[in-house]
């Protein structure tokens, strides 16, 4: 398995399995001289960790992070930063019924056909449990971006199943377990999830992520375009089946006279492009949306096959999120931050001294 590293100059390599002794990552390329403590990282991990409400998996993991290297006397040294998170609440017996069968919608079948072996306990390496190290690495990236460039990366849930969540204010996001930017709709979301859980079923979600303060110039055309790398990173999150940058698929129905964001001396008029033109950041907010499929692990009996190719009926009895999208917001934020810090360093390496006579215009003319 050779696809475990994200990034070019700021790289993150994750390791571990859902029911192994520990999970973690190695961050390479972090600039030296930034203050960093375990508390800085823990604050982000606590936003993602399981067991925080009745609407998510009841697996109780503290997700306490340990910094093993790369930090001396509270400051990054420029050497690899190793983060370790120990697994403490594995319950592998819940997966005894799928040792010889494949769960529909999961990576069981494809991992088996590719590698000839699979860790059936909670999905092993393919588990969303492995997003915890991504959030840990994302905390490092967020801190550097904020302190060096004033970049803020924020996310929220914009839809749960067929329920749209209208945006009200960012302050609402941290006040509810759904990361909803609208406190008034939370009771409806809770009732929806309670009914879903009783049915033994699951549902998908849409998450919006915004990076503000990104300067013009980040991105490496043509194959490492900023939006291309964002899309790749987002699609690397478990259960993500779609990514939009800016207007996304709505662009299909928009005329060029509407979609093309005009430029004025006072700034851009609109941001249909999502803060990226030609694969390079414009200086506007970078806006991303992801579509997350329904959780495949449900209690409803479903048809499948055994390793021998025979018909089978599969029921999943482990502790699972009825909607993985509920905890996806900090994961999506982290992925965006990791792409941005990588491109910030790449831009600095080649074009950090480039200056033009054209003034940098505001992200919005209003």
UniProtKB/Swiss-Prot annotation:
Residues that hold FMN according to the record: 125-127, 238-239, 278, 293-297, 319
Molecular-function annotations in GO: chorismate synthase activity; FMN binding
Entry keywords, A to Z: Amino-acid biosynthesis, Aromatic amino acid biosynthesis, FAD, Flavoprotein, FMN, Lyase, NADP
Pfam families the record matches: Chorismate_synt
A Gene Ontology term for the protein's cellular component: cytosol
Cofactor binding description: Reduced FMN (FMNH(2)).
InterPro entries named among the record's database cross-references: Chorismate_synth (IPR000453), Chorismate_synth_AroC_sf (IPR035904), Chorismate_synthase_CS (IPR020541)
Reactions the enzyme catalyzes: 5-O-(1-carboxyvinyl)-3-phosphoshikimate = chorismate + phosphate
Top-rank taxon: Bacteria
Subunit annotation: Homotetramer.
Annotated family: Belongs to the chorismate synthase family.
Function, as annotated: This reaction introduces a second double bond into the aromatic ring system.
Record protein name field: Chorismate synthase
Organism, scientific name: Burkholderia vietnamiensis (strain G4 / LMG 22486) (Burkholderia cepacia (strain R1808))
């Amino acid at each position: 398995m050779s696809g475990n590293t994200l990034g070019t100059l700021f790289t993150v390599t994750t390791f571990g399995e859902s029911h192994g002794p520990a999970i973690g990552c190695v961050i390479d390329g972090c600039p030296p001289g930034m203050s960093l403590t375990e508390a800085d990282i823990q604050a982000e991990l606590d936003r993602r960790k399981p067991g925080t409400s009745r609407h998510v998996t009841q697996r109780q993991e503290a997700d306490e992070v340990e910094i093993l290297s790369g930090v001396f006397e509270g400051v990054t040294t420029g050497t690899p930063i190793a983060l370790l998170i120990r697994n403490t609440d594995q319950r592998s017996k819940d997966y005894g019924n799928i040792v010889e069968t494949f769960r529909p919608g999961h990576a069981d079948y494809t991992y088996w056909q590719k590698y000839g072996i699979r860790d059936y306990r909670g999905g092993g390496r393919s588990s969303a449990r492995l997003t915890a190290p991504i959030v840990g690495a994302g905390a490092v990236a967020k801190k550097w971006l904020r302190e060096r460039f004033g970049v803020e990366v924020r996310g929220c849930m914009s839809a749960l199943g067929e329920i749209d969540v209208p945006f009200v204010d960012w302050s609402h996001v941290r006040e509810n377990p759904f990361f909803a930017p609208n406190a008034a709709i939370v009771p409806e979301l809770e009732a929806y999830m309670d009914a879903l859980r009783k049915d033994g079923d699951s549902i998908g979600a849409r998450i919006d992520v915004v990076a503000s303060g990104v300067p013009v110039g980040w991105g490496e055309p043509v194959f490492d375009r900023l939006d291309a790398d964002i899309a790749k990173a987002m699609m690397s999150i478990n259960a993500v089946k779609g990514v939009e940058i800016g207007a996304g698929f709505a662009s299909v129905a928009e005329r060029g006279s509407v979609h093309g964001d005009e430029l004025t001396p006072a700034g851009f008029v609109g941001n249909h492009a999502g803060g990226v033109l030609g694969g390079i950041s414009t200086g506007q907010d970078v806006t991303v949306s992801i579509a997350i499929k329904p959780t495949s692990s449900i209690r409803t009996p479903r048809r499948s096959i055994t390793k021998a190719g025979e018909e089978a009926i599969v029921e999943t009895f482990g502790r699972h999120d009825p909607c993985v999208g509920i905890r996806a917001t900090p994961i999506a934020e982290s992925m965006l931050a990791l792409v941005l810090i990588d491109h910030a360093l790449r831009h600095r390496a080649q074009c950090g001294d480039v200056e033009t006579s054209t003034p940098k215009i505001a992200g919005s003319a209003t």
